[in-house]
């Protein structure tokens, strides 16, 4: 009877060791939110700094007319006819 109990204890011990050493399956629904949050903050910071550099560099070329005003108003700036002239010259 003693040998039967020894065999039973040995089998239970082996089963416990096999279950403890078995590789755990990858659960596809377990997410690492900490690394996702850090990655998002890094990308947001890079885009923010890139936007500030673009604004400060003044190298962004726009299609519309970028003539700087000299501070003196045009002689016909406020009239309806001059606004029509300005619009018609832009289309050419």
Swiss-Prot record:
Modifications the protein undergoes after translation, according to the UniProt entry: Major plasma membrane substrate for cAMP-dependent protein kinase (PKA) and protein kinase C (PKC) in several different tissues. Phosphorylated in response to insulin and adrenergic stimulation. Phosphorylation at Ser-88 stimulates sodium/potassium-transporting ATPase activity while the unphosphorylated form inhibits sodium/potassium-transporting ATPase activity. Phosphorylation increases tetramerization, decreases binding to ATP1A1 and reduces inhibition of ATP1A1 activity. Phosphorylation at Ser-83 leads to greatly reduced interaction with ATP1A1, ATP1A2 and ATP1A3.
Modified residues (Phosphoserine): 82-83, 88
Modified residue annotations for S-glutathionyl cysteine: 62
Disordered: annotated segments: 65-92
S-palmitoyl cysteine lipid modification positions: 60, 62
Annotated positions of the Phosphothreonine modification: 79, 89
Gene Ontology annotations of biological process type: negative regulation of protein glutathionylation; positive regulation of sodium ion export across plasma membrane; potassium ion transport; regulation of cardiac muscle cell membrane potential; sodium ion transport
TM annotation in the entry: 36-56
Signal peptide range in chain numbering: 1-20
Membrane topology, Cytoplasmic segments: 57-92
Gene Ontology molecular-function annotations: sodium channel regulator activity
Complex and partners: Homotetramer. Monomer. Regulatory subunit of the sodium/potassium-transporting ATPase (NKA) which is composed of a catalytic alpha subunit, an auxiliary non-catalytic beta subunit and an additional regulatory subunit. The monomeric form associates with NKA while the oligomeric form does not. Interacts with the catalytic alpha-1 subunit ATP1A1. Also interacts with the catalytic alpha-2 and alpha-3 subunits ATP1A2 and ATP1A3. Very little interaction with ATP1A1, ATP1A2 or ATP1A3 when phosphorylated at Ser-83. Interacts with the non-catalytic beta-1 subunit ATP1B1.
PANTHER family reported for this sequence: PHOSPHOLEMMAN, SODIUM/POTASSIUM-TRANSPORTING ATPASE SUBUNIT GAMMA
Name of the protein: Phospholemman
Organism: Bos taurus (Bovine)
Chain's gene name: FXYD1
